[in-house]
């Protein structure tokens, strides 16, 4: 999984501030080409899947892919086996039927290799420009924005599921009305729609799980849940609750790692000390960028409860909390094995490129992981 950003020679905890960065259109496009090349490399190294993200208007250079489905089509043309996922399509920022059409096209053109990854969004600059609002379940001041975002997401996903799976469909909700009444068509009126194309291969749907309501909803829908940036104690609680809700909803117990995916930032070097030195600038740049959006709320505070909003963790804290896996190949392998023992992890998404890293560095990381770490789990 890559954020997909521009190379930076000044990443780290100090200046410049994220909002003070600005990159040229040529630098942004060069990063886009390097992302595609990295996907091709992943296929050659034997990785199962390659995940892109969706972000908009990021002149700061951290995440320069606005449409992972479109870029995924290019990757599909240049690969034969690699599965292509979106982590995540921000559903409320799309017209749901356009998202369904585009996903079905990618899935079919790739021979069934696309993975539908969905999320609700985190960035107001993107959300409010593209037709939705962003709130926070645990912030009373934003509760109404959160409610509206969830309503929009829920209805959009109902539309998408109908469109992808039913030959004919209609949907009439509070937010979406498809087809709206009174559309004339050759002497009659339109009362149902058919998506063209529809998927001709089975597909998976995965959603980021970052709040209690989402934890209750995703397994009821029958999708996979993606867990990231949480202390293992919180991850285990959520992981187990996901399984409980799944069994309640579907009458079947999941295997320990089934329908759940763990995401971990990772960095491998010849020695532990070297790994720490190499990853620190990207780690610190990442939290300088993401901390204000509340991404560190899954860290554990000194009282054993979730960390206070706005925490900017240091690298040692991220390592101690087992949220970042850093060290030699043996160190990282042992930490992955620890998570397999704790959770039964079978779906592991690795994040080997920190903000600002060079694509030469990520090529090295992917090679080390594929050669020195992952074979022990095959």
Identify the residue ranges that each predicted region occupies.
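Hydrophobic faces of well-ordered beta-strands that scaffold small-molecule active sites
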Residues: 1, 50-52, 83-86, 114-118, ...
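N-terminal beta1-alpha1-beta2 module of alpha/beta enzyme domains
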Residues: 1-81, 203
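An alpha-helical appendage that flanks or caps ligand/catalytic pockets
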Residues: 1-23, 137-195, 234-345
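Active-site mouth loops of central-metabolism enzymes
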Residues: 17-33, 89-97, 199-210, 266-269, ...
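Conserved, mostly hydrophobic/aromatic
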Residues: 42, 46, 54, 75, ...
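Acidic (Asp/Glu)-rich catalytic clusters
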Residues: 43-44, 73-80, 103, 107-113, ...
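Alpha-helix-loop-beta-strand connector modules within alpha/beta enzyme cores
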Residues: 62-86, 152, 367-378
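A conserved active-site cap/scaffold subdomain adjacent to cofactor or substrate pockets
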Residues: 208-234, 238
């Amino acid at each position: 999984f890559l954020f997909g950003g521009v190379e930076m020679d000044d990443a780290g905890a100090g200046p410049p501030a994220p909002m003070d960065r600005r990159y040229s259109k040529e630098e942004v496009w060069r990063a886009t080409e390097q992302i595609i090349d990295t996907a091709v490399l992943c296929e050659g190294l034997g990785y199962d899947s390659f995940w892109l993200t969706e972000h908009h208007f990021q002149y700061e250079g951290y995440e320069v892919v606005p449409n992972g489905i479109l870029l995924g089509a290019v990757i599909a043309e240049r690969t034969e086996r690699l599965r292509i996922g979106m982590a995540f399509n921000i559903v409320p920022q799309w017209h749901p039927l356009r998202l369904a059409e585009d996903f079905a096209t990618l899935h079919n053109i790739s021979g069934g290799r696309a993975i539908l990854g969905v999320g609700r969004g985190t960035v107001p600059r993107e959300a409010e420009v593209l037709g939705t609002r962003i709130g926070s379940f645990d912030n009373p001041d934003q509760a109404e924005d959160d409610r509206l975002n969830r309503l929009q997401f829920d209805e959009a996903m109902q539309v998408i599921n109908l469109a992808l799976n039913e030959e004919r469909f209609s949907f009439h909700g509070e937010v979406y009305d498809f087809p709206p009444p009174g559309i004339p068509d050759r002497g009659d009126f339109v009362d149902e729609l058919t998506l063209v194309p529809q998927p001709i291969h089975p597909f998976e749907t995965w959603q980021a799980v970052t709040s209690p309501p989402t934890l209750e909803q995703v397994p009821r829908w029958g999708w996979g849940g993606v867990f990231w940036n949480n202390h293992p104690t919180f991850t285990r609680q959520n992981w187990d609750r996901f399984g409980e809700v799944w069994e309640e909803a579907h009458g079947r117990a999941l295997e320990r790692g089934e329908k759940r995916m763990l995401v971990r930032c990772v960095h491998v070097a010849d020695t532990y000390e070297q790994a720490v030195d190499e990853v620190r600038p990207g780690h610190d740049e990442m939290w300088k960028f993401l901390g204000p959006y509340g991404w560190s709320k899954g860290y554990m505070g000194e009282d054993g409860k979730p960390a206070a909003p706005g925490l900017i963790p240091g690298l040692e804290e991220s390592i101690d909390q087992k949220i970042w896996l850093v060290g030699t190949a043996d160190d990282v392998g042992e930490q992955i094995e620890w998570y397999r023992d704790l959770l039964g992890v079978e779906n592991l998404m690795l994040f080997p490129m920190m903000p600002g890293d060079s694509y030469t560095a990520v090529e090295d990381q992917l090679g080390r992981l594929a050669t020195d770490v992952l074979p022990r789990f095959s």
